[in-house]
A protein has these predicted regions:
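Conserved C-terminal RecA-like helicase domain
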Residues: 75-76, 85-88, 92-103, 264-344, ...
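Conserved pre-motif I regulatory segment
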Residues: 2-49
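Conserved segment of the helicase C-terminal RecA-like domain
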Residues: 379-419
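Short amphipathic alpha-helical recognition elements used for nucleic-acid or partner binding
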Residues: 791-834, 851, 855
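Conserved interdomain linker/interface between the two RecA-like ATPase lobes of SF2 helicase motors
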Residues: 184, 191-197, 201-275, 317
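C-terminal helical accessory/scaffold domains
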Residues: 445, 486-488, 494-495, 499-690
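DNA-binding patch around the recognition helix
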Residues: 754-772, 836, 843-889
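Post-DEXD/H (motif II) to motif III coupling segment of the RecA-like Helicase ATP-binding lobe
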Residues: 155-211
Length: 889
């Protein structure tokens, strides 16, 4: 089926041309079936089960673009932020010229959240858990959405990610607006059960566009079964006599690379990726990759950079989560170009990477947490995990005849078992996982999102889930489910996250924060307890980070720590010394450890290590020094910083519900942003630009030269900024980014010398009188009164417009219809509020929510549903009030 024939389905010519450039003139068979037989461009739900690289991703893309061009809002859901970034950049690059606005949202990409809440997008690429949080904060968002595409749908069976995805799909399924669902999944057993639950048509296609030889290499012979034809065959490889798993991997990679073929090797551990790359680089006779090494030399000095430099001398590299963003991008780019001949990667990154290749070599083992024994150990991978990795081989356009997926072993018995299991065996059945999640977390989520408000409604929603219909309803009596649900509700009520009023369950402010931030009930209870005890204390980053690290959510953030390191480093002694130095040693989180004689527990040592490491990170201690001090690599430090950034933001919201002054939330916001970028407070605004290659060292170089704001860079011009940075690649990306921002919002650049805040109403009144219009919004700061369209907005507790959001709204009112930068907004709040110190630049998403929510409460439902566009937040630029306003001071 030719792409051009899609014109019959009302696909416009500009989109058809984009598709032709992206995938060629012809659709693949599974794509043609989706359109002709399964109504891809219709209204029905659809699930596509097909192998990796079979073309199912483009099925989702076609449905998505057709819906977006039909003026429907679309969510594209992915499991990982790395995959979200990759898909966002791809879609933005591909469809910007067609007029589609593509945005992205994950825990550490929050700048588009306001636009999503306001419906100011066409396609939003969102991580599973983040959409769940967005729907809690803005449940009406579902009313605007016409299509939800779920990539990697098979993760509904994953014990870690499955519960969040299943609950999200349950909400979508039960929503009144009934958005259409298109699911994309690797092949699983009994797929009809999932299709039946989602009321979806089921397209199962097991063919691949390029033949794949799936088999096992043992003692120099690669026995395989062809995926499409089922034909059995064998190939001879060099037998170098290896017996250990690692040596067998290296031998296979060396043989294939020696033939001039590219190889991707999946191993079970991050350390193994580095070790194997170093060993093979030392013994393989492959050319030096000079261009990549030159690029690498311009990046920040890290241990990973040195290891990569060593392996790239033989066109070999490694890829794992310990690399920085810049290092990962470099490796991926040079591997896609074919210059890197052998790449060693962790199996956990198989899903997030789009690195197609002719040959994939697979270790065959994975690290698995055995709950029964409370420990980690090596286990065989599942069939679906194998398919996900092997599917990277033999991708269309990269392998003309066939690809290879190669498991390695020196045991002929093991080879026969694996060949049968992975090349011809049955797929695992779909097993629901919602029962694995704490039931109290599900209760809070459903209450906060408005999907349930009583015991019976909670039970009905849970029984409507995939787990409910396929497991609970069949294996658990009503009394058993009621007992479990009663316990979960009791935990929520006793923890202050829900109340009972006249037979109904109501979410509290604390419960709302718990659900919207996704931190879990157990973590919220512990953080709320700290917040109540500490609300009169000055904020200490060391204390906050230690408390966060000791919470359940903080403990779940992985950092390696050996027994030897635990004993030798004595992180308890280090953190008590730092606490004494910071004059916070008397605070409970530290004081309780002063008199301890026994060695610190593993959990305590791990929490102390994370807190100390993150304190060094935000104080701009050199990254190589941090690596040496805490025995971690730069990528891991950044990853932990990003994960804690989200947790600290949640702590700020929890603290306000526990009695902290609203104005103090900005202290948590500032700390959260510093954790994201690893900088001191004066570099935060430039860090928000998120320019790839503009790391901590270069940001500090700009700050030392007097630049802390984007406007200052624009005022001095490119020549001066280039001279200061002295880094060609980073400068070009930086200047391109801020130039685009200036083009998008020219009225805000260059920055005014002083923020102009209207302190009297006359100029606005004159403008309104001239146009014959009356103000929709009236703000009287002296009388502490706010009216919108004649409806009084509460300015006193409860559920009121608090002081800082009120002042910010007043600043926006003084520039009604104009864009106000976040810096100008902070300065305006200080001026109107007669503050001695200018507050930290606000979190625009949070501020917008706190301005809009009290206004919505004051309005009838029909008016409240239509004011999401009243206050606009523009990424990287500022905020704008979209109505006529009158301000009296």
């Amino acid at each position: 089926m030719r792409i051009t024939t899609l014109e019959a389905y009302n696909i416009t010519n500009d989109i058809l041309e984009i598709w032709r450039e992206s995938v060629g003139d012809e659709l693949l068979p599974v794509q043609e079936r989706a359109i002709k037989e399964f109504g891809l461009f219709g209204d029905n739900n659809l699930i596509v089960f097909s192998p990796t690289s079979s073309g199912k991703t483009f099925i989702g893309e076609m449905a998505m673009v057709k819906a977006a061009k039909s003026d429907l809002k679309v969510f594209y859901l992915v499991p990982q932020k790395a995959l979200a970034e990759e898909k966002f950049e791809e879609l933005q690059r591909r469809y910007a010229k067609a007029g589609l606005r593509v945005v992205v949202s994950s825990r550490d990409r929050r700048e588009f959240d306001d636009a999503i809440a306001a419906g100011n997008f066409n396609i939003a690429v969102v991580v599973f858990e983040k959409l769940a949080a967005l729907l809690i904060g803005c449940p009406q968002l579902l009313e605007k959405v016409g299509l939800v595409v779920v990539d990697e749908l098979q993760l509904i069976t994953d014990e870690n990610r499955g519960p969040a995805l299943e609950l999200l799909l349950t909400k979508l399924k039960m929503a009144k607006s009934k958005p259409r669902i298109v699911g994309l999944s690797a092949v699983l057993g009994k797929a009809h059960l999932l299709a039946h639950w989602l009321e979806a048509k089921l397209l199962v296609d097991t063919q691949r566009p390029v033949e794949l030889r799936k088999g096992v290499l043992c003692k120099g012979t690669f026995k395989y079964r062809e995926h499409n034809s089922g034909t059995l065959g064998s190939e001879e490889f060099a037998d170098m006599g290896g017996t250990e798993r690692q040596e067998l991997l290296l031998e296979a990679a060396e043989d294939l690379a020696g033939r001039g073929e590219q190889v991707l090797v999946f191993v079970s551990a991050r350390a193994t990726t580095v070790l194997c790359a170093r060993i093979l680089a030392d013994r393989a006779r492959l050319p030096m990759l000079k261009s990549a090494i030159e690029e690498l030399d311009e990046q920040e000095e890290t241990h990973a950079r040195e290891a990569l430099r060593e392996s790239l001398s033989s066109s070999i590299a490694f890829h794992n989560s310990d690399l920085s963003r810049e290092e990962r991008a470099l490796v991926e780019r040079h591997f896609r170009s074919g210059e890197i001949r052998v790449l060693f990667s962790t199996s956990t990154l198989a899903m997030g990477m789009n690195l197609p290749v002719k040959n994939v070599v697979i270790e065959g083992k994975k690290w698995h947490y055995f709950k029964r024994y409370d420990r980690w150990g090596l286990d065989d991978m599942s069939r679906s995990e194998y398919e996900n990795m092997s599917g990277r081989a033999g991708r269309l356009g990269l392998a003309k005849e066939y690809g290879r997926s190669i498991l390695v072993t020196d045991s002929r018995f093991q080879a026969d078992v694996w060949l049968e299991k992975y090349a011809a065996g049955d797929f695992e059945e779909i097993v629901p996982t919602l029962a694995e999640a704490p039931l109290e977390d599900l209760v809070i989520d459903l209450l906060a999102s408005g999907m349930a408000g009583s015991d019976d409604e909670l039970r009905d929603m849970l029984l409507s889930s995939f787990t409910g219909t396929t497991s609970w309803a069949l294996k658990m009596s009503k009394d058993e489910l009621k007992e479990k649900l009663d316990k979960a509700i009791a935990i929520c009520v006793e923890g202050g996250m829900a109340t009972r009023e006249k037979g109904r369950l109501k979410i509290t402010d604390l419960g709302f924060v718990c659900a919207s931030k996704g931190v879990g009930v157990e973590t919220t209870i512990s953080l709320a307890e700290w917040a109540r005890e500490s609300r009169r204390s000055a904020l200490s980053p060391l204390e906050v980070l230690t408390v966060a690290a000791q919470s359940t959510a903080g403990a779940d953030v992985y950092v390696s720590m050996s027994k030897q390191e635990r004993w030798k480093a004595d992180y308890r002694r280090q953190i008590l010394g730092r606490a004494e130095q910071d004059r916070v040693i008397e605070r409970p989180v530290f004081a309780g450890h002063i008199l301890e004689q026994d060695a610190a527990s593993h959990d305590s040592s791990m929490a102390f290590k994370k807190a100390l490491m993150l304190c060094d990170w935000i104080e701009e201690v050199g990254i190589k020094e941090i690596e040496q001090r805490y025995l971690v690599w730069a990528g891991a430090v950044r990853r932990v910083g990003e994960d804690f950034s989200w947790l600290i933001e949640a702590m700020g919201a929890i603290s306000v519900t526990c009695g902290w002054d609203e104005s103090r939330k900005s202290e948590f916001t500032e700390l959260s942003e510093r954790l994201q970028y690893g900088v001191k407070r004066d570099a935060v605004e430039l860090g928000r630009l998120r320019v790839l290659g503009l790391g901590r060292t270069l940001l500090r170089r700009l700050v030392r030269a007097g630049y802390t704001r984007v406007q200052e860079l624009l005022e001095d011009g490119p020549a001066r900024v280039r001279e200061v940075l002295n880094h060609r690649g980073a400068f070009e990306k930086l200047w391109m980014k801020i130039s685009k921002m200036k083009e998008a919002t020219p009225s805000t650049y260059p920055k005014k010398a002083q923020p102009e805040v209207l302190l009297a109403a006359e100029p606005v009144e004159r403008a309104m009188a001239a146009s014959g219009n009356e103000a929709e919004l009236l703000i009287d700061l002296k009388a502490n009164r706010v009216c919108y369209r004649g409806h009084q907005v509460a300015t006193r507790p409860p559920h009121h417009l608090q002081r800082t959001p009120l002042l910010a709204l007043a600043v926006l009112a003084s520039h009604a219809g104009e864009l106000v930068s976040l810096t100008e907004l902070a300065e305006g709040v200080a001026k109107l509020g007669h503050l001695k110190k200018i507050p930290v630049t606000p979190d625009a998403r949070d501020l917008r929510y706190k301005m809009l929510r009290p206004i919505k409460r004051a309005l009838p439902q029909d008016l409240a549903d239509g004011i999401d566009d009243l206050i606009e937040s523009i990424h990287g630029a500022g905020m704008k009030l979209n109505c006529l306003a009158e301000l009296r001071c």
